[in-house]
Amino acid sequence: INDTNNFKKIMKAQKINSLTLKKKLTRSSDAHKGEFGHVLVIGGNIGFGGAGLLASRASVNCGAGLVSLATRSSHVSASLNFCPEVMVKPVDSGQALEKYLNSPSVICLGPGLGQDFWSEQMIYKSLEAAKKNNVPMLIDADGLNLLPKFIKKLPLPKKVYGHGWILSG
């Protein structure tokens, strides 16, 4: 993760217009949402609920077939009002998170995660499950801030991504 030169080599941006995007996003009439991946967003600690909501909505808008948000139980109602397409999971402990870690095709960890005990449980359980199930992870914000604490305790999943500007900082 700290090898920013290598990261910049694999990070390729491509300018697209609405016509190109429409062609890429075309789905057959008999397509099922299960064919387009399951994103699990983990975040939205107390006082930071909006970040998890925004990441979840972005996943829906990008075309993910299923999107789940694992967040504090105090954010469930607001989350469902904001984006009813998202399956909101009340998670107030690492143990509560475990049951949602077996089905995603990608885990997004960090939006509004914070840096308290709850945050540490979320990162520990998600790293453990991603490694075990060979699921790629996108780690953002406080997820990246907490990552060094866990690198020695847990092997990282094979595919871990983060924002280039955060990784280069």
Go through the PLM ranges and name each one.
Residues 1-141, 145-169:
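Small-residue (G/A/S/T)-rich helix-start motifs and N-terminal tracts that mark the onset
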